[in-house]
Amino acid sequence: MFEKLSCHTSIKIGGRVKYLVLPNDVFSLERAINVLGDVPFQMMGLGTNLLVQDDDLDIAVVKTERLNQIEIKGEKVLVESGTPLKRLCLFLMEAELGGLEFAYGIPGSVGGAIYMNAGAYGGEIGEFVEAVEVLRDGKRTWLSKNEIFFGYRDSTFKREKSIITRVMMSFKREKKEVIKAKMDDYIKRRLEKQPLDLPSAGSVFKRPREDFYVGKAIESLGLKGYRIGGAQISEKHAGFIVNAGNATFDDVMKLIEFVRKKVKEKYGVELETEVEIWWNGRRW
């Protein structure tokens, strides 16, 4: 039975896969990966920073959305990889553990956030990681923070064949009302500046350097609202490409390349995509 990935990505684009695997816990995830054996597969969290080809993919997809348990251990928190970031932020607020407020409103799972070292407003999730449990060569093992590289929208996990299963994170005590005030401020800013009313895959491009703001650069080129097919540069924030109506993978890819070309011509800067791209069953 085929499953449409367009039903599982926030931008509402994606072809069909023959197998969609939804493990209920870490143990069933481990079993599923071992059962798949030589069958090619890709891991998916909540599909929020992902662009998938329209054609059918001859792979299995393992989605971690049911791995969403959180366990508190003093000022440390053990989180399963499929846990939505929003849920973790609300849990931390109730537990009066501060630091991750900047992530409130970032869509996606904890595993996906660790994979790309998600961040916003000067904070990055990698700052709070104590250890990560991964599934490697069919077995689960823990990596300490000293064994993990985190960079700007980058991590060890983009370079090696391992699957994030659980994360141990460390936070500091903070009053609930202080945490809530920060979270309210961040979500207000997101609502004001980001196109949360339309399907998208989030911020499309990485910032090439600290003083170069991609959205402002694209806006300066007069490209807000520019459209190819159903894919459109957001009129609210030029760093986002939205699905304005029946957009295809090809529409979005053409728009990405068009923007990269124009920015290169004007500013001499090569933009790299932040959004993950699946094409021919591979990550790009």
From Swiss-Prot:
Pathway: Cell wall biogenesis; peptidoglycan biosynthesis. This is UDP-N-acetylenolpyruvoylglucosamine reductase. It comes from Thermotoga petrophila (strain ATCC BAA-488 / DSM 13995 / JCM 10881 / RKU-1). Its EC number is 1.3.1.98. The keyword Translocase does not apply. Keywords: Cell cycle, Cell division, Cell shape, Cell wall biogenesis/degradation, Cytoplasm, FAD, Flavoprotein, NADP, Oxidoreductase, Peptidoglycan synthesis. Its main location: cytoplasm. Cell wall formation. One of its GO terms (cellular component) is cytosol. It comes from the Bacteria. Transmembrane segments: none annotated. Its cofactor is FAD. It is found in: Cytoplasm. It catalyses: UDP-N-acetyl-alpha-D-muramate + NADP(+) = UDP-N-acetyl-3-O-(1-carboxyvinyl)-alpha-D-glucosamine + NADPH + H(+). Gene3D superfamilies: 3.30.465.10, UDP-N-acetylenolpyruvoylglucosamine reductase, C-terminal domain (3.90.78.10), Uridine Diphospho-n-acetylenolpyruvylglucosamine Reductase, domain 2 (3.30.43.10). GO terms for biological process: cell division; cell wall organization; peptidoglycan biosynthetic process; regulation of cell shape. The active site is at 153, 203 (proton donor), 274. It holds the Pfam family MurB_C. InterPro entries: FAD-bd_PCMH, FAD-bd_PCMH-like_sf, FAD-bd_PCMH_sub1, FAD-bd_PCMH_sub2, MurB, MurB_C, MurB_C_sf, Oxid_FAD_bind_N. Belongs to the MurB family. Residues 12-174 form the FAD-binding PCMH-type domain. One of its GO terms (molecular function) is UDP-N-acetylmuramate dehydrogenase activity.
